[in-house]
């Protein structure tokens, strides 16, 4: 998913269409959030330099690696320095790795496929890209399903493969199949996964964001990050019990959490 976004950001000639699945559009927002190090779910400690090391396949061939080892180590050291894990700040290093800055170079039609429950590449990657494409007026489409990371095929009542085929037939083969007139936004219901909501804009027409004030009284709220105040037991690794206590307990005495409670919604939220 990410590679085709990066290629499209170069403005290379001949690239007519891309279909990023769970693609990254801004590397800072993948590894950071407001100055904090925020790795993907189940990838604690991950960062750009570790990903680069993981992807450097030439290291698997000892003889080949010797010919590039010096250059690789120098480039890798620059990654470690540039990512600045100690501060977590947005910098020129990260700005250069923000493909949204190159949106004016995009020429290809973009069909984004992304899982709403993807906690590896989150939706803060696909939605800003779609909005940027929308603002530029480029041919675009986004399919938001209820799956996780890169789970796209055989989605009930989605016709995903048919849409992909029509997209490629139109933009690569020039077939007049009116795919560009189909809804630009498809969102799978989180209640009935056989139903899909269609719209031509994001947010979808008729939808609105709900704001939740977290400090309505302007009082400063604090918590103490201390596992000893919970039921968590490192020896047992009882994460479920810890989560149940954190979320479900009605007690307000826990010093290790801040809990915001609103009245029930009057209408459905999907």
Model-inferred region functions:
Residues 1-6, 120:
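Glycine-rich nucleophile elbow surrounding the catalytic serine of serine-hydrolase chemistry
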Residues 6-105, 176:
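Accessory cap/linker subdomain of secreted extracellular hydrolases
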Residues 12-17, 107-110, 136-141:
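Loop/turn elements at helix/coil->beta-strand transitions in domains of secreted/extracellular proteins
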Residues 74-107, 238-270:
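Alpha/beta-hydrolase fold catalytic core
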Residues 106, 112-114, 118:
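Short beta-strand/loop motif that positions the catalytic acidic residue
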Residues 119-127:
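Conserved alpha/beta-hydrolase "acid-adjacent" motif
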Residues 133-150:
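Catalytic histidine neighborhood in serine/cysteine hydrolases
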Residues 155-270:
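C-terminal, loop-rich substrate-recognition/catalytic regions characterized by aromatic stacking residues
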